[in-house]
UniProtKB/Swiss-Prot annotation:
<dbReference type="GO" id="GO:0005829">
    <property type="term" value="C:cytosol"/>
</dbReference>
<dbReference type="Pfam" id="PF02622">
    <property type="entry name" value="DUF179"/>
</dbReference>
<protein>
    <recommendedName>
        <fullName>UPF0301 protein ESA_00394</fullName>
    </recommendedName>
</protein>
<dbReference type="InterPro" id="IPR003774">
    <property type="entry name" value="AlgH-like"/>
</dbReference>
<comment type="similarity">
    <text>Belongs to the UPF0301 (AlgH) family.</text>
</comment>
Amino acid sequence: MNLQHHFLIAMPALQDPLFRRSVVYICEYNNEGAMGLIINKPLENLQVEGVLQKLKITPEPRDPAIRLDKPVFLGGPLAEDRGFILHTPPDAFSSSIRISDNTVITTSRDVLETLGTAEQPDDVLVALGYSSWEKGQLEEEILENAWLTAPADLNILFRTPIADRWREAAKLIGIDIHTMPGEAGHA
């Protein structure tokens, strides 16, 4: 089982406030554990434009057709002061890792400097913090019915309205998440 470039979809019974009704995009999955970003929990009162202002980044030349009023997401409870930018290729930035043919994660400032310009990647999701699981921990949580898994979908990752991402991710595997009992699988 390789969960890289997959969604973790919180089961209705998962009540942890941070992960309740969350969708996590798995960026890295290997024999040491897993790392991902929550893609449906926007931070209140923080948009991409505000991050750029705090970092004193002024897009040059500014393309007014590109909106910078998009939300910044809480990627998870770890390193909440670090930025993680999920985007579509190119991966020519100084600190980029290709997750799949169509997704890249970058942690360097140079990708932020392209935001709002014609050079920015086509699709971008900015998150602060990340989620992580030690070796075997995520698999155990899946066996305990905390999570559903589904192959990632770029439309859900970048374009689906935030409030719909949990439901739409579950639909990828034929599940209507709103009709699932809270204790599914615990017969």
